[in-house]
Regions:
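Ligand-binding "clamshell"
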Residues: 110-122, 137, 210, 215, ...
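Short helix-initiation/N-cap motifs at beta->coil->alpha
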Residues: 79-90, 177-206
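Pocket-flanking alpha-helical
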Residues: 85-116, 132, 138, 223
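Short, polar/charged alpha-helical segment
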Residues: 55-78
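C-terminal motif of bacterial Sec signal peptides marking the signal peptidase cleavage site
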Residues: 17-21
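Alpha-to-beta junction loops
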Residues: 93-103, 147, 170, 192-195, ...
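A conserved helix-loop-strand patch within extracytoplasmic ligand-binding domains
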Residues: 122-171
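Bacterial lipoprotein signal-peptidase II cleavage site
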Residues: 22-34
């Protein structure tokens, strides 16, 4: 990444306030991404910063914590909220955004490789965790042969869901599998015949009415009104 005065200022101000406000939350730290060579970056002369986020805790983080801190330094902050995990990185690469905050680093790495994007991690922030939530069944003890579980359909988050199911003993992954890249092909055993339903992450909260359990990303859980304490 080409380091600029703009991104040095942004990273220092944003990271300081995020860590102060959210340091107690747990999960793999999501990456704030920036264009590796931002065409619109004019160094210290740039005064408007366009953030891209997904709905939920990421947008709230920008509005409640990062934006006030940057405005005190004389910047204008514009927030663009997306309803999916695809458009924020494409918009960043196309120059519509200066920075985005919505993803963890494995997702960023997979996405930019697949789409051949010249974007890079700027800094990391905490977020609400991925969780297994009740659907038609309300407790882990109710799992039965043929139970259905919805999960994110993007590779990195689907891998996290598989690791979660493996830890519960609902499926068994092959020995030595990389937990960051696990896929259905890495399932060695499925003793409960779990039916995994892959969906866009934004659809997972609504899917709970149709499946027995749902693996839901934290930001979409919060934006849909779910309580993180509902996770099993």
């Amino acid at each position: 990444m080409q380091t600029t005065t703009f991104f040095k200022t942004l990273s220092a101000a944003a990271l300081a306030v995020v860590l102060a406000a959210c340091g107690g939350q747990k999960d793999s730290a999501p990456a704030a991404a920036s264009a590796a060579s931002p065409a619109a970056d004019n160094g210290a002369a740039k005064k408007e910063i366009v953030f891209g986020t997904t709905v939920g805790d990421f947008g709230d983080m920008v509005k409640d914590q990062i934006q006030p801190a940057l405005e005190k330094k004389g910047y204008t902050v514009k927030l663009v909220e997306f309803t999916d995990y695809v458009r924020p990185n494409l918009a960043l690469a196309e120059g519509e955004l200066d920075i985005n905050i919505f993803q963890h680093k494995p997702y960023l790495d997979d996405f930019k490789k697949e789409h051949k994007l010249d974007i890079t991690e700027a800094f990391q922030v905490p977020t609400a965790p991925l969780g297994l939530y009740p659907g038609k069944l309300k407790s882990l003890d109710e799992v039965k042969d043929g139970s259905s579980v919805s999960a994110p359909n993007d590779p990195s988050n689907f891998a996290r869901a598989l690791v979660m199911l493996n830890e519960l003993g609902w499926v068994k992954l092959k020995d030595g599998v990389n937990p960051l890249t696990a896929s259905k092909a890495d399932i060695a055993e499925n003793p409960k015949n779990i039916k995994i339903v892959e969906l866009e992450a934004a659809q997972l909260p609504r899917s709970r009415a149709d499946v027995d359990f749902a693996v839901v990303n934290g930001n979409y859980a919060m934006s849909s009104g779910m309580k993180l304490t509902e996770a099993l």
